[in-house]
Amino acid sequence: MANLVLDLELSGIEPGWHEIIQLGAALYDKEWNLKSTYISNVYPENRESFSLSSQKIHQLSLEELEDAPILHEVLEDFEEWLTKYLKHKSLRSLNICGQSVMYDIVFLKAAYRQEKKEWPFSNMLIDLHNIAFYLFEVLAKNGIKTPRSLSLNAIADFFDLKREGLEHNALEDALITGECLRECMNYTNILKLKA
């Protein structure tokens, strides 16, 4: 089963009021080999909801989003991109992955509802936050120093993964999350249960 790693940049934290302003995704096969990437800015139709505190995180201004496609166009383009790389398999054949991925899914589902589109994805989730929590507990109990935080940066630092650029965007976070998930899954080849 293929793995779709998502990350969204948002105009704020309240689904239904705040909006998706950038969608980034990385598509991996079941062995966590990167197959393709996707990124698009999204024009914020509710300009009142654009939060300055969120802008400090994603560093996208309203002016930069002025020429971005609207949400409906981005969702259509996103699904077309996925279908192309899935060789026309159903989008329900994907694991949806991310760092605290439920937060992104809540916003993405709200976007699908707003656009009166049916949710095309499965309910199969892989959450880096949860996997890292469990893995780090096991490693700590075996004497390996683990991060004190479960932030994406802390998990990435543990695996010696670094951001490529200085800018924070949804695609870079999706790629770093995917690489962290690959590293977590690599431990399944190392960790053994005692009989």
Question: Which sequence ranges carry the predicted segments?
Answer:
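Conserved non-catalytic scaffold segment of RNase H-like nuclease domains
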Residues: M1-A111, D157-H168
